[in-house]
From Swiss-Prot:
It comes from Aquifex aeolicus (strain VF5). Belongs to the spermidine/spermine synthase family. NCBIfam families: MFS_SpdSyn (NF037959), PRK03612.1 (NF002956). Residues 187-448 are annotated as: Spermidine synthase. Catalyzes the irreversible transfer of a propylamine group from the amino donor S-adenosylmethioninamine (decarboxy-AdoMet) to putrescine (1,4-diaminobutane) to yield spermidine. It catalyses: S-adenosyl 3-(methylsulfanyl)propylamine + putrescine = S-methyl-5'-thioadenosine + spermidine + H(+). Pathway: Amine and polyamine biosynthesis; spermidine biosynthesis; spermidine from putrescine: step 1/1. Its main location: membrane. The active site is at residue 358. One of its GO terms (biological process) is polyamine biosynthetic process. This is Polyamine aminopropyltransferase 2. GO terms for cellular component: plasma membrane. Its EC number is 2.5.1.16.
């Protein structure tokens, strides 16, 4: 194999590895720091800046040292990219240190990636004329980037998970280093260094699960009994003593210590106002806990919409989850749809008596859609005239603007809106909003089913507390102006 051919293969592999490295660090930042839009923007921007600086720095490398510099850059990348995952998790419980570590890693890795193309062009300059040299090097870099981006989204992250994906990127960098070592025949120390790097990376690849589990358990502070990366999210179930907690992408969804406070309020307060029990819809609620409470009512049909079929499978088959949700997914009245909730509401021809919106907080543009004016207007058309819906509306203490914006948006859609605030020890003061086409009378409120935590007095107290909250001057959340994302991260930032 000629040096020029080997070099072009190297550039293809480095283009592939570079995109995987960028996406892996952006995903890692999202998992640990939150705010997907912000983290992807910041990490990719840091990469672009550092790649430019790396390209600039390449001019100071003497011509006779360019092959050595290229190989060393690939060897460093082959270790730095894979090890960035456990390094970041090690600092996961310190927000300021974590930001410095992730952004610092992005800068260093980006700088090394920035060296690649200028060095490759200079090495290849001996074998091809300038116009062919530059175009062929850039061509191979771009061609390597395209499959990397697609495979990352559709295969690597959902099937391999983040740690193994980063290891894969490292091996592509290592292959590039070995190719150049083979054709350039450098000094023995470089061959030894390449072999040593291979053994380090291979050892980490074999033991990465143990290392990752150790760092993950430090992050969650509890024993991890189930860990799964799906195409949509990372599912983690933990145990602490007799209690279990579920996390999605690092965010707590429930703890068995107090989840009934949330789910009983979410279901039984609005359900007690219903005049008919024919057809119900749950949007989200893939853990089956809202469904567990809803099954107590004599609905003829229950539809549940959750984007992630793996979440449904986990909740249906995992023995711990089955015990918590009381085998709710085996109810014969249930029909599950693995679809996006926003799109389902928009296209369905069904009319419902009761709708429960039990979805994640509006942390991203995608999740903010199901708290938008357009969504609530679509939902209004899917409710019967005496139908009722309820949505979770987030933390009312630290993120009151989020709660107030959701409340205002529901009113803007033409609903009668009734705020509830329930205290949940693991979450704090948590808001919910009931929406109805007809006015509801809380003075005559009576629970229709037996509950473990909820009673009439508590339900009325939750409504009284909800009404008493003073809302700041917030905007309505829309698709074109998703203000909820700004409100959600305002306190944290």
């Amino acid at each position: 194999m000629s040096v020029s051919t080997a070099l072009k293969l190297c550039i293809f592999f480095t283009g592939f590895a570079g995109i995987v490295a960028e996406y892996s660090l952006a995903t890692l930042a999202t998992y640990l720091l939150g705010n997907a839009v912000l983290q992807w923007s910041v990490v990719i921007s840091i990469f672009l800046l550092s790649m430019g600086l790396g390209s600039h720095a390449s001019r100071y490398i003497p011509d006779d040292k360019t092959p050595l510099a290229f190989v060393l850059a690939e060897l460093f990348l082959s270790l730095l990219v894979p090890f960035s995952v456990p390094i970041a998790y090690h600092f996961a419980n310190n927000f300021l240190h974590l930001q410095t570590v992730i952004y610092g890693l992005s800068f260093v890795i980006g700088s090394l990636i920035g060296l690649e193309i200028p060095l490759a062009v200079r090495i290849n300059n001996m074998y091809e004329e300038l116009k062919v040299n530059i175009s062929s090097v850039l061509e191979k870099d771009y061609l390597g980037s395209v499959p990397a981006g697609l495979l990352y989204a559709y295969l690597f992250l959902p099937k391999l998970g983040l740690p193994l994906t980063a290891i894969l990127a490292g091996f592509f960098n290592l292959i590039s280093a070995f190719l150049l070592v083979k054709v350039l025949k450098p000094k023995k120390f470089l061959k030894f260094l390449a072999i040593f790097t291979f053994f380090l990376l291979a050892t980490y690849a074999v033991g990465h699960k143990r290392i990752t589990l150790y760092e993950e358990q430090k992050f969650y502070g509890e024993e991890i009994i189930h860990f799964e990366q799906t195409p949509y999210q990372k599912i983690v179930l933990t145990r602490f003593g007799k209690h279990y907690s579920l996390y999605l992408d690092g965010h707590l969804q429930f703890s068995t210590l107090d989840e009934k406070r949330y789910h009983e309020t979410l279901v039984h307060v609005p359900a007690s106002f219903l005049k008919r029990y024919e057809k119900a819809l749950i949007l989200g609620g893939g853990d089956g806990l809202a469904l567990r409470e809803l099954r107590k009512y004599p609905f003829g049909e229950i539809h549940l919409v959750d984007l992630d079929p793996k979440m449904i499978e986990f909740s249906k088959k995992n023995l711990v989850m089955r015990k918590i949700n009381e085998n709710s997914f085996y109810d014969t009245r249930l029909k599950v749809f693995s679809e996006d909730a926003f799109n389902f509401v928009k296209k369905t021809k069904e009319k419902y008596d009761f709708v429960i919106v039990d979805l994640i907080d509006p942390r991203t543009p995608s999740s903010a859609r199901v708290y938008s004016l357009e969504f609530y207007m679509s939902l209004k058309n899917k409710l019967k005239e005496d139908g009722i819906f309820i949505t979770q509306a987030g933390d009312t203490f630290y993120k009151r603007e989020v709660f107030c914006s959701i409340l205002k948006t529901i009113k803007k859609a033409g609903f009668y809106a009734y705020p509830l605030v329930v205290y949940i020890p693991t979450f704090g003061e948590w808001g919910m909003v009931i929406g109805s086409k007809e006015p509801l009378n809380f003075e005559n409120f009576e629970l229709k089913e037996k509950t473990e935590f909820l009673n009439r007095e508590r339900a009325l107290a939750f409504y009284t507390l909800g009404k008493s909250l003073e809302c700041p001057n917030v905007e309505v959340n829309t698709l074109l102006k998703p203000v909820l994302i700004y409100y959600y991260y305002k306190i944290q930032n």
